[in-house]
């Protein structure tokens, strides 16, 4: 069931976004990211007031470490959005796709080094195969794959840091 819902979410989330952001290619990336952040904040704040426990929200701000990590993750996700929106606006959707494609590989490596997660033989084989394919693609590019690396790395580091912070989902 989870795989089916994951595929449905990917279709509804992944397909419309490049089409939507392509229509905004005349607007500066930073402005689109600022609007996305601002309106997300407004929407989530209203949602918090309507259906959540305010004390859980206030609890987040009782730890400096938690605030620090959440601030870093906010900048990482904003930078990731900027990379995605910029790549779509520059008609480099494949760079964005490749960035998100390499994210699991980067996440596995980060988990191994920072979370002491074990890499099973199948995971190791898949990382090696993916790495060889990516290196082949990178070698054949005419330019340094900055956007690909930025999108994949910023998303993976965001995931790693968010895993370090316990925030009540209510």
Residue spans for each PLM region:
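Hydrophobic/aromatic residues within transmembrane alpha-helices
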Residues: 23-24, 32, 36, 87-88, ...
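Hydrophobic/small/kink-forming positions within alpha-helical transmembrane segments
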Residues: 11-15, 74, 78-82, 104-109, ...
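C-terminal transmembrane-helix exit sites in multi-pass transporters
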Residues: 86, 103-123
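Specific transmembrane alpha-helical segments of multi-pass solute transporters/efflux pumps
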Residues: 57-94, 136
């Amino acid at each position: 069931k989870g795989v089916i819902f994951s595929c449905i979410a990917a279709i509804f989330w992944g397909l419309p976004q490049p089409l939507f952001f392509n229509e905004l290619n005349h607007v500066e990336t930073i402005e689109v990211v600022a609007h996305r952040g601002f309106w997300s904040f407004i929407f989530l704040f209203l949602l918090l007031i309507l259906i959540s426990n305010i004390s859980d929200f206030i609890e987040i701000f009782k730890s400096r470490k938690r605030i620090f990590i959440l601030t870093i993750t906010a900048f990482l996700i904003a930078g990731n959005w900027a990379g995605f929106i910029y790549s779509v606006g520059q008609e480099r959707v494949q760079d964005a796709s490749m960035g998100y494609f390499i994210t699991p590989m980067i996440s596995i490596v980060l988990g191994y080094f920072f979370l002491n997660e074990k890499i099973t033989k199948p995971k190791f084989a898949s990382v090696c195969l993916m790495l060889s394919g990516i290196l082949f693609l990178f070698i054949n590019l005419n330019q340094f794959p900055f956007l690909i690396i930025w999108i994949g790395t910023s998303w993976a580091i965001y995931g790693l840091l968010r895993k370090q912070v316990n925030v009540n989902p209510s």
